[in-house]
C-alpha cells in the first residue's frame, strides 16, 4: 500500500476519465450528488486509486470524503 497521497493532477485526470466512461461531468464525480451514475463514476475513481495501492484514508483526503465512505464504496 502506498502511504503517500495521490496527486491532485492524478485525481483530476482519473475523475475526467471516470466521468467520460459514465457520461457525466467531472464535477459530478467529485461532487456530493447521489444519482446512480454519479455514484458509479465516483466508485470507479476510488477503485482505480485503490488498485494503485493508495489507502482509503489517502483517497478520502484527496477527494474530500471520510475514509469510511470510501471503504464502504469499495466493498460493493
Each predicted region: which residue ranges?
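Short, amphipathic alpha-helical "recognition" segments used to contact nucleic acids or chromatin
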Residues: 37-54
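Short, Lys/Arg-enriched N-terminal segment that forms or immediately precedes the first helix
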Residues: 20-35
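General nucleic-acid-binding
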Residues: 1-17
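Residues within well-ordered alpha helices
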Residues: 17-18, 48
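Short alpha-helical "recognition helix" segments of helix-turn-helix
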Residues: 57-62
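The DNA-contacting recognition helix of HTH DNA-binding domains
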Residues: 66-67
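DNA major-groove recognition helix of helix-turn-helix
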Residues: 50, 63, 74
Amino acid at each position: 500500500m502506498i502511504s503517500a497521497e495521490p496527486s491532485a493532477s492524478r485525481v483530476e485526470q482519473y475523475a475526467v476519465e471516470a466521468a467520460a466512461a459514465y457520461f457525466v461531468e467531472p464535477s459530478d464525480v467529485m461532487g456530493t450528488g447521489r444519482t446512480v451514475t454519479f455514484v458509479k463514476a465516483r466508485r470507479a475513481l476510488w477503485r482505480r486509486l485503490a488498485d494503485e495501492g493508495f489507502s482509503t484514508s489517502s483517497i478520502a483526503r484527496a477527494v474530500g470524503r471520510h475514509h469510511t465512505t470510501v471503504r464502504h464504496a469499495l466493498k460493493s
